[in-house]
């Protein structure tokens, strides 16, 4: 059995100095000798702590503007030396054992994210000595504790107090894992950055410099293991980005209910990202990653009521997302009316949570407020590869629209068109959305033929007794033939919004003119597969 190891000497060298003085003081008061470098050493000395500069310890000064500080046998021998095996040779060369290394690395990611960052700026923020110490300490975790996260400081002090100044093997091993994850992520960032410069430096034109690196290195942290994946015979886990700040299903806090399933997370993501499109109080109900009801109103209660009416059958067992706080009245309406898997909102009132708590199977997530959409990448796994693209954050405003028919849309039709265009972006292709008065009337999703999606949207509306006449229709891509317009006219659609771009646009526009339909082109497609 591995024994706890005492911590008598610690080397501290950090770029992010948050909490380091308090941590160093806690170590010092517990009899730990402090070694440090450069700015960290000065900070500790200014705080009145007894600290030995690494250059004084090694007898070798920092040089080359700080590029060489800790790359010395007395440092790495003290870290890598195996207690009980290398003691004699360490004593022979006056190498003192270092029991703890506290390091975080130069801020490479923050540097290259700054506007105007040059290659020289990036190069000077590539840490060499730091990762070397981190890897050395992690390799010798049997004897040495490596600390790379300030969030671990408090727990480490607590354990030292509980174990007479020692840390257990389990703790050292866990810290070593974090250390290797830390250096792997750091090296990945550097590789991605340099790889993204290849087009610029090699004269290639296949991709803009700074977008897609030659080799893509990804780092995600496991948030939870799952009972199973999309189906019960598939194992699964949920991984998240470490530094994500945007309100999302990945950063949401679950305040009620049993663990989220694989499908819960996928559907909740679809619902939340859709509801983010709206600035007014909105509700989105999703089933199998497709919106089955969306509405905007003066309150989330009314928005929910109207979204539910689009397709009550599909809403059963669905995911509900709001862009305002979940209040008690809305919570009561939901649990009284339907079975729901997940409710997600920026926040939830205490009274609302008391109501949802009566339904133990209802999962409630709060994700915080959002201000704007954050650019990023989307991934699609194919056998043997990975498709990577920008997130679809494309939006259109009234100023971007082109009316291509003889009849101009009314103000109401224009509002309805923009509303259902936002919804269509989140419906699986081929996608058709009927809407009127900021409420979806019918949604046709995922059909191989666009005209059948249009027909399904009409059937859905008819099944629920919703009046289609006078509604707007959105299509996520162009109409290849006029049949989709004929189908829309047959149920009373009076305005169509679509990207345009078909070789038969003239025929499609002529069909709209024949039926007296106003047609708007967005010149932007929203395929979703």
From Swiss-Prot:
Family: Belongs to the PurH family.
Pfam families for the chain: AICARFT_IMPCHas, MGS
Organism listed in the record: Cronobacter sakazakii (strain ATCC BAA-894) (Enterobacter sakazakii)
Domain MGS-like: 1-148
GN (gene name): purH
Name of the protein: Bifunctional purine biosynthesis protein PurH
NCBIfam families per record: PRK00881.1, purH
Enzyme Commission code(s) on record: 2.1.2.3, 3.5.4.10
UniProt-listed InterPro entries: AICAR_Tfase_dup_dom_sf, Cytidine_deaminase-like, MGS-like_dom, MGS-like_dom_sf, PurH-like
Gene Ontology MF terms: IMP cyclohydrolase activity; phosphoribosylaminoimidazolecarboxamide formyltransferase activity
Keyword annotations of the record: Hydrolase, Multifunctional enzyme, Purine biosynthesis, Transferase
Pathway connected to this protein: Purine metabolism; IMP biosynthesis via de novo pathway; 5-formamido-1-(5-phospho-D-ribosyl)imidazole-4-carboxamide from 5-amino-1-(5-phospho-D-ribosyl)imidazole-4-carboxamide (10-formyl THF route): step 1/1; Purine metabolism; IMP biosynthesis via de novo pathway; IMP from 5-formamido-1-(5-phospho-D-ribosyl)imidazole-4-carboxamide: step 1/1
């Amino acid at each position: 059995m591995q024994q706890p190891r005492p911590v008598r000497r610690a080397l501290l060298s950090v770029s992010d100095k948050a909490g380091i003085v308090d941590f160093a003081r806690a170590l010092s008061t517990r009899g730990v000798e402090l070694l440090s470098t450069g700015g960290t050493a000065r900070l500790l000395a200014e705080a009145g702590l007894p600290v030995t500069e690494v250059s004084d310890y090694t007898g070798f000064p920092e040089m080359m503007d700080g590029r060489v500080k800790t790359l010395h046998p007395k440092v790495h021998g003290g870290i890598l030396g195996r207690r009980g095996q290398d003691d004699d040779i360490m004593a022979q060369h006056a190498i003192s054992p270092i029991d703890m290394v506290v390091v975080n690395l130069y801020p490479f990611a923050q540097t290259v994210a700054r506007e105007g960052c040059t290659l020289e700026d990036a190069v000077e923020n590539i840490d060499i000595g730091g990762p070397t110490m981190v890897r050395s300490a992690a390799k010798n975790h049997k004897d040495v504790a490596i600390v790379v996260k300030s969030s671990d400081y408090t727990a480490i002090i607590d354990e030292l107090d509980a174990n007479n100044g020692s840390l257990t093997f389990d703790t050292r091993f866990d810290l070593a894992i974090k250390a290797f994850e830390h250096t792997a992520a750091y090296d990945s960032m550097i590789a991605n950055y340099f790889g993204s410069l290849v087009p610029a430096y090699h004269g290639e034109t296949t991709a803009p410099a700074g977008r897609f690196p030659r080799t893509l290195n990804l780092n995600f942290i496991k948030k939870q293991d799952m009972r199973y994946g999309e189906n019960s015979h598939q194992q699964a886990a949920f991984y998240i980005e470490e530094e994500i700040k945007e309100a999302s299903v990945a950063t949401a806090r679950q305040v009620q209910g049993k663990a989220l399933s694989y499908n819960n997370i996928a559907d909740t993501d679809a619902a939340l990202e859709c509801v983010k499109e709206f600035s007014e109080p909105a509700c989105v109900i999703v089933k199998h990653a497709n919106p089955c009801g969306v509405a905007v109103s003066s309150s989330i209660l009314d928005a929910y009521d109207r979204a539910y009416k689009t397709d009550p059958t599909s809403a059963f067992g669905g995911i509900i997302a709001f862009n305002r706080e979940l209040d008690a009245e809305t919570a009561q309406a939901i649990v009284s009316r339907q079975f729901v898997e997940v409710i997600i909102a920026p926040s939830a009132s205490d009274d609302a949570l008391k109501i949802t708590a009566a339904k133990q199977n209802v999962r409630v997530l709060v994700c915080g407020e959002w201000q704007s959409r954050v650019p990023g990448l989307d991934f699609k796994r194919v056998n043997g590869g990975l498709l990577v693209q920008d997130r679809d954050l494309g939006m259109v405003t009234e100023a971007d629209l082109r009316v291509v028919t003889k009849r101009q849309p009314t103000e109401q039709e224009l509002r309805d068109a923009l509303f259902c265009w936002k919804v269509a972006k989140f419906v699986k292709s081929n996608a058709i959305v009927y809407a009127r008065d900021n409420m979806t009337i019918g949604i046709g999703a995922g059909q191989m033929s666009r005209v059948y999606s249009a027909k399904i949207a009409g059937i859905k509306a008819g099944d629920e007794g919703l009046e289609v006449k006078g509604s707007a229709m959105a299509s996520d891509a162009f109409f290849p033939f006029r049949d989709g317009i004929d189908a829309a006219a047959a149920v009373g659609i009076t305005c169509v919004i679509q990207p345009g771009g078909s070789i038969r646009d003239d025929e499609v526009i002529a069909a709209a003119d024949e039926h007296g339909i106003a047609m708007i082109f967005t010149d932007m497609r929203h395929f979703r597969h």
